[in-house]
Amino acid sequence: MERDFLGLGSKLSPITVKEETNEDSAPSRGMMDWSFSSKVGSGPQFLSFGTSQQETRVNTVNDHLLSSAAMDQNQRTYFSSLQEDRVFPGSSQQDQTTITVSMSEPNYINSFINHQHLGGSPIMAPPVSVFPAPTTIRSSSKPLPPQLTIFYAGSVLVYQDIAPEKAQAIMLLAGNGPHAKPVSQPKPQKLVHHSLPTTDPPTMPPSFLPSISYIVSETRSSGSNGVTGLGPTKTKASLASTRNNQTAAFSMAPTVGLPQTRKASLARFLEKRKERVINVSPYYVDNKSSIDCRTLMSECVSCPPAHHLH
């Protein structure tokens, strides 16, 4: 019984010693150690962990960095996770220990520096220099050749490399030149409308009413009774003078240069009017009849009464 117990104890003793050697290994302090066996078929196993104080320090630092940087774990890519821990296996296969190099802390520091503006004051951009570069100063030191532009008669003329003295001389010559005379605008000519000569309508001859003359002859008869007998004789006035007066009036009217057609129409109108006046007059007597009447009346007046002859 005791031998078996001692045998078990002797078997367990090297294991405890092996664990102590693993705990005292220097490379495994403060980090998680991954050990790989020399055999190909064997998988990775967790052998030992750091002390509780080291784990708490790492956890507090990680929590502080994550809270200040406000990083989301979902945004971390697969490549960044690969760069966190790089494992370099040792040369000796007997110890079966590995040296691990952690790249997590520099990454956290860089991320804290880059994302500091999320929790604190924003990072100022680098100042932009206002002063021009030396190349621009060199290029601007060479002045451009002066140009002379002249607008003349609707055309634009540009001359290169003109000295200021020449430009001033040209301007003085242009200013001292003869002043442009104002262009006299042609006067608008008045349109002359050739109108027909306005002539007064021909004055119509005055209508002569037939004059009726009454010839009264008083014959005193010396009779026994002493009775005087008045024998008034009414003679019809002659209208022959009216025709002569009308012809004289027509001759006195001014002759107007009218077309032949108007003259002919006017003559026809006057003839018809004269005929109407003559036909309408109630006492129409020819010249011959009027002369005979006058001679007869004169003879009657001059002759003595018939009863005196007896």
From Swiss-Prot:
Induction: Up-regulated by wounding and herbivory. Residues 141-176 form the Tify domain. It comes from the Eukaryota. InterPro entries: CCT_CS, TIFY/JAZ, Tify_dom. Pfam families: Jas_motif, tify. PROSITE patterns: TIFY. One of its GO terms (cellular component) is nucleus. A motif (Nuclear localization signal) lies at residues 261-268. A motif (Jas) lies at residues 259-284. Ubiquitinated. Targeted for degradation by the SCF(COI1) E3 ubiquitin ligase-proteasome pathway during jasmonate signaling. GO terms for biological process: jasmonic acid and ethylene-dependent systemic resistance; jasmonic acid mediated signaling pathway; response to cold. Keywords: Jasmonic acid signaling pathway, Nucleus, Plant defense, Transcription, Transcription regulation, Ubl conjugation. SMART domains: TIFY. Repressor of jasmonate responses. Interacts with and suppresses RHD6 and RSL1 transcription factor activities to negatively regulate jasmonate-stimulated root hair development. Homo- and heterodimer. Interacts with MYC2, AFPH2/NINJA, TIFY10A/JAZ1, TIFY6B/JAZ3, TIFY5A/JAZ8, TIFY9/JAZ10 and TIFY3A/JAZ11. Interacts with RHD6 and RSL1. The jas domain (259-284) is required for interaction with COI1. This is Protein TIFY 6A. It comes from Arabidopsis thaliana. The lineage of its organism: Eukaryota, Viridiplantae, Streptophyta, Embryophyta, Tracheophyta. The gene is TIFY6A.
